[in-house]
Amino acid sequence: MAVHNLKDLLAEGVSGRGVLVRSDLNVPLDSDGEQGRITDPGPDHRVGADVERTGRGGRQGGGRRAPRASQEWAGPGVVAGPGGRRARRAAGPARAAGLGRGGHRRPGPRRGVDRRRRPAAGKHPVRRPRNVQGRRRAARAGRQMAELVGPTGAFVSDGFGVVHRKQASVYDVATLLPHYAGTLVAEEIAVLEQLTGSTKRPYAVVLGGSKVSDKLGVIESLATKADSIVIGGGMCFTFLAAQGFSVGKSLVETEMVDTCRRLLDTYVDVLRLPVDMVAADRLAADAAPQTVPADAIPDDLMGVDIGPGSVKRFTALLSNAETMFWNGPMGVFEFPAFAAGTKGLAEAIAAATGKGAFSVVGGGDSAAATAVELQLLFPLVRLIARLA
């Protein structure tokens, strides 16, 4: 089945039509969260159509309100509930990009979609959405989203990290409207093909994050293609435990230890583990960090970042790479005391990119880390912030 893209939609014509664009907006809606996905929706919002933007987001945490932590967004107005003011603030860059007044609240029902008559094409802006989560049936929400653009409307799927999800704003609405792949989806597929096909060598991969189970497929896929794979973040402790090393109170997926041992045996010349770690007695901003050997973390401490010796070793490796892919932070970068490893490797990747290497940063966490620590280096690195 052929995949229709934005060029096909433009060829058909968008004048007088509504276009529903699904973006990947799944970021924490708090004062510290990274706003890149909200403030930089991408080129599909500049095609001159009457655009409605949809997405899904939420707040971190659990408790009694946890079932409502995720919200699907669609249609006129702003996010109803947590993060509403944040979405309105994020609308500011939309004005600078010529997208209209995004985030403008129109009168209408507090919940659901405003079904009032749509303004004439081109007369209203790209709008931040109203919360449509909490409906008993996702199909109903999908129908209401489709109603936003009317019977002549179209649906553009531009959230690469969510295209596989069976959500109202991804799946149901696509069954109701002519649908097209957005520019960002097409670009990210092209980049991934470059990373998994013929690449310039040396080819280095940097993987972080909490769990080996989340990255197992990536490791097994790239281990036969890359020259080296750096393992950091919380996932490195399961690999260290698989070698029989003491990891203290660090995160370990016990059910993945045998898998890590197999990977280490199979790809001994490819996988690279830290030689030292930054450790602390607890995960807190005021916890005192100390550097310890990676193979002998004290029982009363947990690893929270890769150490300076590891940063030096991995920086030397990355400085010679011609192709690089980074997915996941090296430590708990949200706390400045535990962010040096992530920042150091990001600087190394940016420096190599400035000399002509091809580099890709993928994944919400590592993209956020780059944004927070290295905003001036952003133009040097191909960022796939939507790649999970």
UniProtKB/Swiss-Prot annotation:
**Ranges of Basic and acidic residues composition bias in the record:** 34-55
| EC main group | transferase
**Pathway listed:** Carbohydrate degradation; glycolysis; pyruvate from D-glyceraldehyde 3-phosphate: step 2/5
User: Among its keywords, does the record have ATP-binding?
Assistant: yes
Presence of keyword Transferase:
yes
**Catalyzed chemical reaction(s):** (2R)-3-phosphoglycerate + ATP = (2R)-3-phospho-glyceroyl phosphate + ADP
> Where is the region Disordered?
26-136
Give EC number(s), comma-separated: 2.7.2.3
UniProt xrefs under Pfam families: PGK
Keyword list, A-Z: ATP-binding, Cytoplasm, Glycolysis, Kinase, Nucleotide-binding, Transferase
- Localized where? Cytoplasm
Quick one: where is this thing mainly located? Answer: cytoplasm
Subunit comment: Monomer.
| PANTHER family xref list | PHOSPHOGLYCERATE KINASE, PHOSPHOGLYCERATE KINASE 1, CHLOROPLASTIC-RELATED
Name the chain's protein: Phosphoglycerate kinase
**What organism, scientifically named, is this protein from?**
Mycobacterium avium
Q: Which gene encodes it?
A: pgk
